[in-house]
């Protein structure tokens, strides 16, 4: 199990600020990369180091498929303990169902942070389909 590293709070804040400033673009700032960068900031490790480096939705899907995952929810569930969204803490990750599209996001002090095609959005925890504990 991955553990939280010293200074993870500051590193998490930096990741959130960086992604808020980046454009919505596959391989730059998307629903997987926000979560993977969060995991890296908190634990010092990427979830799947070879799953980055894509530039399109198809490329992202191929990276997940290489690990036999159909979506980010399956990728997260293979690495982390599933928890009830109401038990999630800052820095934990989760997914929402956005009209059939499974999108990853991060639990923050402001709500559940996700990225759509245009911007970062903070949603209420009640919108989260599944949550995953990132280190402890």
Model-derived features: positions:
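N-terminal capping segments
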Residues: 1-66
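Generic alpha-helical propensity signal that fires on short helical segments
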Residues: 42, 112-114, 130-132
